[in-house]
A protein has these predicted regions:
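Structural preference for solvent-exposed beta-strand-turn elements
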Residues: 1-182
Length: 182
């Protein structure tokens, strides 16, 4: 391991030239999929990886009423939402992935209510979603936990606010940004 004061010098006989294809990222795709809830326009996403969490999020969106077509061969997703989606994200779909909680902010912003199962599927260990909930409350959401579900409402809509997370949370930041877009 190099310290900050050391350097690594590579001497080679040829300049590097060429192109490489970068594969799509699950961690970029999942919040984009959740954010599609906010629009009734057709959305096309390219360079989508064919991994379990992505296919589970597609199942969730379909269950909620979105029309989602995924071509693993083309690495492309097309999404068109009906005028009104279901605001329930059930346990049977969220039990295997943490990112399902990202639909909470989108549903609250657009429909002013959501019932979202507490997430599962984390190989890293327990990572609570309290930071998501605290920030959404700061934006005006009423939230309660009941029978393994987050039941949230924002009768008057969510309101913009200044909020600084007490610690870094990529997922909570994504959720609040999505919630702030509608």
């Amino acid at each position: 391991i190099l310290s900050l004061m050391q350097k690594l010098e590579i001497q080679g006989g040829k300049k590097l030239v060429g192109t490489i294809n970068i594969s799509g990222s699950k961690n970029a795709t999942l919040p984009i999929l959740a954010a599609t809830i906010l629009t009734d326009k057709k959305v096309i996403i390219h360079n989508v990886p064919s991994v379990r969490d992505v296919t589970t999020m597609i199942e969730l969106l379909n269950e909620m009423g979105s029309v989602v077509k995924f071509s693993a061969k083309e690495k492309k997703i097309e999404i068109k939402n009906n005028k009104s989606l279901k605001t329930l994200a059930p346990y049977n779909l969220l039990k295997t992935m943490r990112a399902g909680v990202l639909v909470l902010g989108a549903l609250l912003a657009k429909y002013k209510s959501a019932k979202v199962s507490l997430p599962g599927g984390c190989a890293i260990g327990s990572r609570p979603i309290n930071l998501h909930l605290i920030a959404l409350k700061k934006m005006g959401a009423k939230i309660k936990l009941k029978n393994g579900y987050v039941i949230a409402s924002a009768k008057d809509g969510l309101k913009g606010c200044f909020y600084k997370f007490p610690k870094v949370s990529v997922g909570a930041t994504e959720n609040i940004l999505i919630a702030s877009c509608f």
